């Protein structure tokens, strides 16, 4: 018999302790992983509802199970809000993740073995953009473009040259570690030149796009995907969008999600997406995203002032790459040193990195989470100087302990959930 007063703490103290420890870590550590953020209590509430009990294979009004009249409303709310948020005429809110959303696009628009042109993982792309270890590189003929080493920006001339040479059926624009502004229109121009679909993965900048401070790819791309966490600050999940008014493609996309790649949707997560989309439509969300960019720019500028190399020389969005090659330091060691001071980052390859992806020569740094907990430009500069203090000599334990104490004090002033 199920009872409302059942809880994890009493039944499974070992698991509860791990959850409590992670909660404490999030409050006492500064989060700078560019793909992480803090969801609102409303999003967390939605994910903890009884919607998790409901199977709802199919789409609103066309389910394979009975009893879906209420979850239909939930999904329709999420769909309509996603369309409004991004100016789309089509939205599929069912993908469990960004990678699964991307896989659905491949399945809908391509045949196995077709040629795709995407950004190299080593230059800031994503696994699903054609990496040889991903389905996108195993099942398809993947050609990769990169950035111009002299500018740190996407080399559009190379993109066009490769497109003309290889005649891809689909060109992929988007990134997981690129600090510039992507020219979606230029990508569409190249795609049209060779008769290719343009598929944009805006997972990292979706929140900035929603706020109108990063170019919207919807007017240019045939299909757009995103995650619903990262800068959108919603639950972990995926989303597929389009604005081309092509019902045939919309039908293919729906079929590629269900039954092509997934079974029943996660209705509790879709409810959380609906909440997050509503939050993103609020005016204060734009203010938040503007501060995200201000903070990232301030951090990149401060690193440069302290003698560190920033790929592309700065940032125009929420993230940037710190190149540590000139410091003779690995990303792995830098990551660990900052972690010891309660500052969480992730090691990351830099363009033409001589080290393996398990070691790397760089760090990826993002501002969405620190901005979410209330950091402004002043705190961002202060934090960056602390990070430089640690990185100037990662063997100096006294500096590490001093910075850790400063981090704890700052975190106490800016609780995640105050």
UniProtKB/Swiss-Prot annotation:
Purpose: Catalyzes the reversible interconversion of serine and glycine with tetrahydrofolate (THF) serving as the one-carbon carrier. This reaction serves as the major source of one-carbon groups required for the biosynthesis of purines, thymidylate, methionine, and other important biomolecules. Also exhibits THF-independent aldolase activity toward beta-hydroxyamino acids, producing glycine and aldehydes, via a retro-aldol mechanism.
EC number: 2.1.2.1
Cross-referenced PANTHER family: SERINE HYDROXYMETHYLTRANSFERASE
Gene name, Swiss-Prot/TrEMBL: glyA
Protein's name according to its UniProt entry: Serine hydroxymethyltransferase
Keywords, ordered alphabetically: Amino-acid biosynthesis, Cytoplasm, One-carbon metabolism, Pyridoxal phosphate, Transferase
Enzyme class: transferase
Pathway: One-carbon metabolism; tetrahydrofolate interconversion; Amino-acid biosynthesis; glycine biosynthesis; glycine from L-serine: step 1/1
